[in-house]
Amino acid sequence: MLHRYLPMTEEDKKEMLQTIGVQTIDELFSDIPESVRFKGDLKIKEAKSEPELLKELSQMASKNANLKEYASFLGAGVYDHYAPVIVDHVISRSEFYTAYTPYQPEISQGELQAIFEFQTMICELTGMDVANSSMYDGGTALAEAAMLAAGHTRKKKILVSAAVHPESRAVLETYAKGQNLEVVEIDHKNGVTDLEVLQSEVDDTVACVIVQYPNFFGQVEKLADIEKIVHQQKSLFIVSSNPLSLGALTPPGKFGADVVIGDAQPFGIPTQFGGPHCGYFATTKAFMRKIPGRLVGQTVDSDGKRGFVLTLQAREQHIRRDKATSNICSNQALNALAASVAMTALGKQGVKEMARQNISKAQYAKRQFEAKGFTVTFAGPFFNEFVVDCKRPVKEINDVLIQKNIIGGYDLGRDYKEHENHMLVAVTELRTKEEIDTLVNEMGAIQ
């Protein structure tokens, strides 16, 4: 019987086989040795009806820790933030939902304007001159920034702070290996980049120095001091930054950063089990023609009306092929739109207030932990994350907390041996006083 959604008949199969010059399916796979071919039936359950399937999938999904029912103190690069309701409404519109950055851009003015607004807001937040249409995520944005630096300076050494997100450093290592670049980690001291070590490592072979602001431990790096060291040898200064924090902190561009990158996830993008998210990439005019990804520019048409185009396309793969600045194409256009809508809905004052609440609530949580007898490991200023010495395995604590509908902080021992039994606690604007107090009390009872 012919399936309504699988219309291929035996005649169709026969015609296709004849077209490619074989008689049977077995002959088609004749180059695969008999000894490794699968014989028999796949152990697949019988097909379910749509209602049965929906019920089973719902039961499976119910096992997840839903952030509507759990209080999350887990950050480490992915955060539980408020997303205005309008975000889902806009990105669900059909003209955006299946968006593809066009090669004939004039036909998609709405899509191009949305990307242009994203670029503009990223520039305003970071204090930079130009931003691209988005990257895959913060990790790949960081690696692409390092590749830009290596290509521009023609130097082979990359210095990266050990206080940069471990997963971003891993992505950097992958990119660097293919380009025969050397990656050197700079130790951290008291939760921030060790400036003495950095000073000793920066020389005329260094393409760039990469730091995170706020860094992986939540601490605010001293960008002014780092910039002086970096630019002494004409290396590039790359800063990875949580864009929400820039609603309260001085933008990296004000400290002389050459490239600012990061992940726009805090703006309107759910945690989504770690992705997909949306990287951003901003730089100065000096590197405008070396920036990866797509750039949308504003112009006027023959009637003098405002319009948008994909500009500086000679950098891109559909023109330069293997000599392109990157192979990024449509990438995260939909998530970039979500970030744009969220930032627009919040407005400048809303972003500042959201950042202020992160700082205020994180400071309250820190004081509560200290009052309960916990040691907060680093004393420096921080944004919305800080490190707590738990004196026992973090996994054991989190296993207990999850039973109380609390998602505990990140286990730093996974990435830093010296910080075994230390928890990275994230406190966003969504956390209430009651939730913070419950977390501290539950952890105090486990001690």
From Swiss-Prot:
Protein name, entry field: Probable glycine dehydrogenase (decarboxylating) subunit 1
Organism whose genome encodes this protein: Bacillus mycoides (strain KBAB4)
UniProt keyword annotations, A-Z: Oxidoreductase
Assembly mode: The glycine cleavage system is composed of four proteins: P, T, L and H. In this organism, the P 'protein' is a heterodimer of two subunits.
PANTHER family: GLYCINE CLEAVAGE SYSTEM P-PROTEIN, GLYCINE DEHYDROGENASE (DECARBOXYLATING)
UniProt xrefs under SUPFAM superfamilies: PLP-dependent transferases
Documented EC number(s): 1.4.4.2
Keyword Oxidoreductase among record annotations: yes
Family: Belongs to the GcvP family. N-terminal subunit subfamily.
Entry function: The glycine cleavage system catalyzes the degradation of glycine. The P protein binds the alpha-amino group of glycine through its pyridoxal phosphate cofactor; CO(2) is released and the remaining methylamine moiety is then transferred to the lipoamide cofactor of the H protein.
GO biological process, one term: glycine decarboxylation via glycine cleavage system
Any GO molecular function: glycine dehydrogenase (decarboxylating) activity
Entries under InterPro entries matching the protein: GcvPA (IPR023010), GDC-P_N (IPR049315), GDC_P (IPR020581), PyrdxlP-dep_Trfase (IPR015424), PyrdxlP-dep_Trfase_major (IPR015421), PyrdxlP-dep_Trfase_small (IPR015422)
Ranges in a coiled coil: none
TM region(s), chain numbering: none
Reaction(s) this enzyme catalyzes, per UniProt: N(6)-[(R)-lipoyl]-L-lysyl-[glycine-cleavage complex H protein] + glycine + H(+) = N(6)-[(R)-S(8)-aminomethyldihydrolipoyl]-L-lysyl-[glycine-cleavage complex H protein] + CO2
Pfam families: GDC-P (PF02347)
Top-rank EC class of the record's enzyme: oxidoreductase
